[in-house]
Amino acid sequence: STMYVGGNFTGVKQGDKGTEISSRGLAAFDVATGDFTGQTFDFNAQVKALLALPDGRLLVGGDFTRVNGEAHSGTVVINPSTGQIDPSWDLQITNALRGGTVSVRALTYYDGNVYMGGAFTHLSGGGSSRVYARNAGRVSLSGRPDRSWNPEISGAVQAVGVSEANSAFYAGGHFTTAHGNQRAWYAAKFSTQPGAAVDTDFDFVPSSATAGKYQQTIATAGNRVYIGGSEHNLFGYDTATNQRVSGAMTFNNGGDLQATTVSAKGVIYGSCHCSDAAYQDMYVWSMNGSWSRVDEIKWVGAWDAATGESLKWTP
């Protein structure tokens, strides 16, 4: 098996004394040994998101416009067996806003479609051209955009997820409205049916009324969806009732949640720029005493995906 790492780098070196091999933006490693596989890539800008497709191909999203010398705006598909670009994926993404640049920052798969979020306005591919998809959209596994589904989110999307429990699409980011004037306050819930209707009963409440509010992680697990970001929060919501049912925050050298993933054993692992403590049952970005327990955290923490309770683990 192969593990891919994407980001903002220019090369790979095996060990401290190894020779650096040029591979810009994406690198591949053998899962069993940790060794570099030798596959090399040349992305002209940062890779932001990776998604393993059901058929084994790797979908890569990011800020790039060229990959290995070819034009690929925002996404490209890689064949993991060879490390070569899949030419059948012809999705091209544009941003028609004045001065706008394309960025695909989040990817997820659900029920035959790839859902994506970022900064863009239109999708073209698979025989369809200039499909309006404001900062979020979905495409088939062949890269054909779905013209019927456009949440029309007002600002850049940082995270996306679809819950198996309720078939709803969740997004987090730098936005406040959707579909023109409907409230979508930094995190929002949408139908996956045509029209992408906003669930107006879902009301995300940030941890601060005056400081940062943007959200940048979404993790779904059973009947819970977990939303993390600024300021310093990981909040859990019940997918059936839309009620917030758990909360954790990081202090004093705390930091915003930046990435989360759910393991096969039901553990949420979350990374943050935090090196002090995680406070359970805290919902407001203030040391006001409203918490039930405090645990050490060093850059990565673990929570029970069923309850949102801290597992008291950190590297």
Set out the residue ranges of the language-model regions.
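Extracytoplasmic surface signature
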Residues: 1-315
